[in-house]
């Protein structure tokens, strides 16, 4: 039976209780504040602030607090560089790529901090732990602004080759800082064949072999850290761009983005949209059609 112990913030505890309030059950243990019987798991919230999750579904419910089980592989126990990117699926905001160097002796610290794939963490949790990660973990962060993105896409780069360039540059710059990884892992966004093809046009190269692995953020803590820092960088950029234009820019590429894009287009024209959005997305044409109604 899986057993996970966490010490989340009181705010996260209250959010969890609100979400699963129908599963609250009585407990005779005087040290348990709240007890929940959930499908495939029980959750005990102690007066000390600790939470004990038990059962087959423990990991699922622990992910609410940012916990992610990291697969134990031989590669995990090596000094390792891992990279990930955030923003490639969002119409608004730039493209953030981060490379991180993590050694095995840092694993316990990272797990206690609650590091997992940024997709499983709330934005609030990401903003909370990123300053600590940036201070303690060697990394290299790059941000391609929307305006620069629009400048290079369709000219020298496409949506895939620009990510190859950024991942390569982040790793290259991190290696220049003197780190010595025994393995380099990229959270796969294309095939190894494609990656090598686009890499050939990059000037800055290194001899270290790389490995492209799907869902690497769940296998390697270095990739998970990169995912978190990249998400924070993307969110900060999204906020700053929106503040300059006077709009709250949504993440993603849904109808909310179409609506805000049409408003920006009406207020500032294509120049304003180019400042904050990736123009080759279909949202641009959808925003134009909204103005024609």
From Swiss-Prot:
Keywords: Cytoplasm, Endonuclease, Hydrolase, Magnesium, Metal-binding, Nuclease. GO terms for cellular component: cytoplasm; ribonuclease H2 complex. Residues 78-293 form the RNase H type-2 domain. It is an enzyme of class 3 (hydrolase). Manganese or magnesium. Binds 1 divalent metal ion per monomer in the absence of substrate. May bind a second metal ion after substrate binding. The keyword Ion transport does not apply. Its main location: cytoplasm. One of its GO terms (biological process) is mismatch repair. Its EC number is 3.1.26.4. One of its GO terms (molecular function) is RNA-DNA hybrid ribonuclease activity. It is found in: Cytoplasm. Disulfide bonds: none annotated. It catalyses: Endonucleolytic cleavage to 5'-phosphomonoester. A divalent metal cation binds at residues 84-85, 187. The keyword Manganese does not apply. InterPro entries: RNase_HII/HIII, RNase_HII/HIII_dom, RNase_HIII, RNase_HIII_N, RNaseH-like_sf, RNaseH_sf, TBP_dom_sf. HAMAP family: RNase_HIII. This is Ribonuclease HIII. It comes from Streptococcus pneumoniae (strain 70585).
């Amino acid at each position: 039976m899986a057993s996970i112990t966490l010490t989340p913030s009181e705010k996260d505890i209250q959010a969890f209780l609100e979400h699963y309030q129908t599963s609250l059950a009585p407990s005779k243990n005087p040290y348990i504040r709240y007890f929940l019987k959930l499908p495939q798991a029980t959750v005990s919230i102690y007066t000390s602030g600790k939470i004990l999750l038990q059962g087959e579904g423990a990991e699922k419910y622990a992910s609410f607090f940012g916990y992610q089980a990291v697969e134990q592989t031989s590669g995990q126990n090596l000094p390792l560089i891992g990279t990930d990117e955030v923003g490639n699926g969002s119409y608004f905001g730039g493209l953030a790529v981060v490379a991180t160097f993590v050694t095995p002796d840092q694993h316990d610290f990272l797990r206690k901090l609650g590091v997992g794939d940024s997709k499983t963490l709330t934005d609030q949790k990401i903003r909370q732990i990123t300053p600590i990660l940036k201070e303690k973990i060697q990394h290299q962060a790059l941000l391609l602004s929307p305006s620069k993105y629009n400048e290079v896409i369709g000219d020298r780069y496409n949506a895939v080759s620009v990510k190859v360039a950024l991942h390569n540059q982040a790793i290259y710059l991190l290696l220049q800082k003197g780190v010595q990884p025994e393995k380099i892992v990229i959270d796969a966004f294309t095939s190894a064949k494609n990656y090598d093809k686009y890499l050939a046009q990059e000037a800055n190269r290194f001899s270290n072999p790389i490995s492209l692995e799907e869902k690497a953020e769940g296998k390697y803590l270095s990739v998970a850290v990169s995912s978190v820092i990249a998400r924070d960088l993307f969110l900060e950029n999204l906020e700053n761009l929106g503040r300059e234009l006077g709009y709250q820019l949504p993440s993603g590429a849904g109808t909310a983005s179409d609506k805000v894009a049409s408003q920006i287009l009406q207020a500032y024209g294509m120049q304003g949209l180019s400042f904050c959005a990736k123009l080759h997305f279909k949202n641009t044409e959808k925003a134009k059609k909204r103005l024609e109604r």
